[in-house]
Design a protein with these regions (language model features):
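Radical SAM/AdoMet-radical enzyme domain recognition
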Residues: 1-86
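Short acidic, glycine/proline-enriched helix-loop-strand junctions
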Residues: 19, 26-38, 50-56, 60, ...
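C-terminal accessory region of radical SAM enzymes
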Residues: 103-136, 167-198
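Short, small/polar residue-rich loop motifs at catalytic or cofactor-binding pockets
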Residues: 147-150
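Short, acidic, Ser/Thr-enriched surface-loop or helix-capping motifs
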Residues: 157
């Protein structure tokens, strides 16, 4: 379904097994979500010839050494990787703190050096945060299309529901459909499609 209907797929995994399983426990609390999803995600990446997908993780205060998670995903064979900082309340134990920022900057520097080294050796990968235009910012097309929620991007829950973005999961006003019925609320897609920064 996803390969047929989606031009780009985002696969949620946080990196190393212990890091992923800490924030992404199984629904019944038993076993490892990492062990369940890793082989499936590898299959998706290969079915797309390592293009038009991202493995996307979140780093938190629990894994400030997130470069290890990025490199773990690369070592597992993924070539399109995005690992981003958590959005959390300051009181959450896993929230990024002000004092974490210098260490996080070091992690980005270490990651950049390792990425250059691997590209030169012929086993590079794309890291989403490094794929930016430092001079011009987002292109006009991206400014017109916005983030792509609801039209270029969908969050699919473990139970198969579609939302325009992971930020909306659980908010029934934004439930767009599911894997069995497809997109049933095209009005939500249209609303997001018509949103831009101009």
């Amino acid at each position: 379904f996803a390969n047929k209907e989606m031009s780009n797929i985002v696969l949620s995994i946080d990196g190393r097994k212990e890091i992923n399983d800490l924030m992404r426990p199984t629904r019944n609390g038993h076993g490892s979500s990492y062990d369940i999803i890793m082989p499936k995600f590898k299959k998706v990446a290969e079915s797309r010839n390592q293009m038009n997908y991202y493995v996307r993780g979140t780093f938190t205060h629990n894994n400030l050494d997130f470069s290890k998670d990025v490199l773990h995903l690369a070592d597992e064979g993924f070539e399109q990787i995005s690992v981003e900082p958590v959005v959390a309340q300051p009181t959450d134990s896993y929230a990024i703190r002000e004092e974490d920022i210098p260490y996080l900057c070091e992690q980005y520097d270490m990651l950049a050096k390792e990425l250059v080294k691997r590209k030169k050796a012929g086993n590079g990968f794309n890291f989403f945060h490094f794929m930016i235009d430092l001079n011009g910012g987002p292109c006009v097309a991206k400014r017109l299309s916005g983030c792509g929620s609801g039209c270029e991007y969908l969050a699919v829950t473990p139970w198969g529901d579609f939302y325009p973005c992971h930020q909306f999961v659980g908010n029934e006003k934004f439930l767009m459909g599911n894997v069995d019925e497809g997109i049933t609320r095209t009005d939500i897609r249209e609303e997001f499609k018509n949103s831009n920064v101009y």
